[in-house]
Amino acid sequence: MTGVFITLEGGDGVGKSTQSALLRGWLEDEGHEVVVTREPGGSELGVEIREIVLHRRGHIAPRAEALLYAADRAHHVETVVRPALDRGAVVLQDRYLDSSVAYQGAGRVLDAGEIRELSLWAAQGLLPDLTVLLDLDQAAARVRLDAARTRFDRLESERADFHERVRQAFLGLAGAEPERFLVVDAARPREEIAAAIRTRAQALIAAGASA
């Protein structure tokens, strides 16, 4: 049996962790094995890379940053994601290659096509079965982040124009692949968002079971 790969994407402060937890609870109640993971930081090596790319103070050259994310992705897919999918689990992942295209491609103003190709190479071509894009106005997301008072994060601390480029890049990716993406207004009540995600996930899993 082949598992199901679901990723959650969007800018910082959109509620990915909340929705991942809600979806996990529902899937486990339905009897599925669920593996919850993230990029960067979904493996022991990834935790070390996460500290560098997100929490290290000081400049990191944009191309170096992109390569660090790709290194994390290559190791994570090979050691965590593919083994879980091979045994039939549902993998719920906070961020994947679409984040690299949005943050390093648009945010850092690198070539988005090159970033995507690098990411696909690192992931051995693995694409999600479903990508949930939680979309939220940048100003509203900023309010949530400020209220959360989390530790220093290099990406969260970027200026508003950076985050707006990231948001528009995500929307562009979703528009280019509507069959893979579910775009949800992250300003909606969290239970409404969770219901929309469950509906799409349920249809995806049912289709896989009947294939």
UniProtKB/Swiss-Prot annotation:
GO cellular component assignments: cytosol
> What Pfam families does the entry give?
Thymidylate_kin (PF02223)
- Give the reactions, separated by semicolons, that this protein catalyses: dTMP + ATP = dTDP + ADP
- Record key words, sorted: ATP-binding, Kinase, Nucleotide biosynthesis, Nucleotide-binding, Transferase
The GO molecular function terms of this record are:
ATP binding; dTMP kinase activity
Coiled coil ranges (UniProt) are none
Checking InterPro entries in the record gives: P-loop_NTPase, Thymidylate_kin-like_dom, Thymidylate_kinase
**What EC numbers are recorded for this enzyme?**
2.7.4.9
Kindly list the positions annotated as binding ATP: G10, G11, D12, G13, V14, G15, K16, S17
Relate the protein's function as given in its record. Answer: Phosphorylation of dTMP to form dTDP in both de novo and salvage pathways of dTTP synthesis.
HAMAP family referenced in this protein's UniProt entry, alphabetically: Thymidylate_kinase
By sequence similarity, the record places it as follows: Belongs to the thymidylate kinase family.
Write the protein's name. Thymidylate kinase
Q: Which organism is it from?
A: Clavibacter michiganensis subsp. michiganensis (strain NCPPB 382)
